[in-house]
């Protein structure tokens, strides 16, 4: 399984599938189509049935049941795109066999080093086979590791018909990183009772709570006058924007929060005297706190409108997704089986809230309860991203074990 999973994963990451929030197409980038076509061919080649790809790049496939029992159909999902924040072009994966616990030189020429001093969790990977970047791109383990693990699990089950299982559905989706993953996902066509996204990080991660999420866009209009004659006339839109930002609680930002704490995050600040635009994301696990955060932003905007004139400030807030716990708690079995699968394989499940969202956050509200399980990756979305092949194999085995447990319990 080791060589098979390395081969799959390193092949996928070499396709640039960075998504683009400024694109209106689906998928948002042509690279995602390139990978999608490869995956469709591979699904057919390993023997999956009902392999389809729709006009929006959503891939679905079936592993038919080989048992007479009435087993609920379950699904596994992973996303094809990589994060827009860091380049995914010309990824050159590097394989570190039997990691010794010391610094890993990612790029000698550029002096880029993956060091346990900066990333102490590297100590957990002594003796593992790691896959890293060459220091100039992200790796794309988020979420091509999930694709490789699902594909390898399906190939294994097809090669081992003695393992009894119900019907399994698989989906590979576009544009998760820009929050659009499930927007055009056909839950009815997928036809699963439960699903799992294989989109988590380190070994043992099992997540069924996500943020409630919104984005806020605030536009400030100023009045530009020659600075030499500006007294009493100029209105500097950037200064109003700074005033807005200064009224948000400084300690409620990503760099000061953890666990169940929510935040306001200023993503971009673009402006000049005449016009400035702020773009925020708002996150909280608690629904009431989430609503209070949005209200706080509107309140600050209203105060500044009073001070500078209503026409000078426009605020728009849009909800993006909600905490999936509300939809998963009532069908707790979907989490319990994943927990048991890990325990059966001597993996300690680590249940924690996702300080982010997955496609599962939205799918759970679309009628498909979808918790998230680990891939084995670390440091997603940047040049220090890496993954343990040993833990990729464990993730693959967890997928197989979940499928076996659903059949055994039917």
Curated annotation (Swiss-Prot):
It comes from the Bacteria. Zn(2+) 2 binds at residues 142, 177, 381. One of its GO terms (cellular component) is cytosol. It holds the Pfam family M20_dimer. Binds 2 Zn(2+) ions per subunit. One of its GO terms (molecular function) is zinc ion binding. Coiled coil: none annotated. Gene3D superfamilies: 3.30.70.360, Zn peptidases. It is found in: Cytoplasm. The active site is at residues 81, 176. It catalyses: Release of the N-terminal residue from a tripeptide. Keywords: Aminopeptidase, Cytoplasm, Hydrolase, Metal-binding, Metalloprotease, Protease, Zinc. HAMAP family: Aminopeptidase_M20. This is Peptidase T. It comes from Geobacillus sp. (strain WCH70). The lineage of its organism: Bacteria, Bacillati, Bacillota, Bacilli, Bacillales.
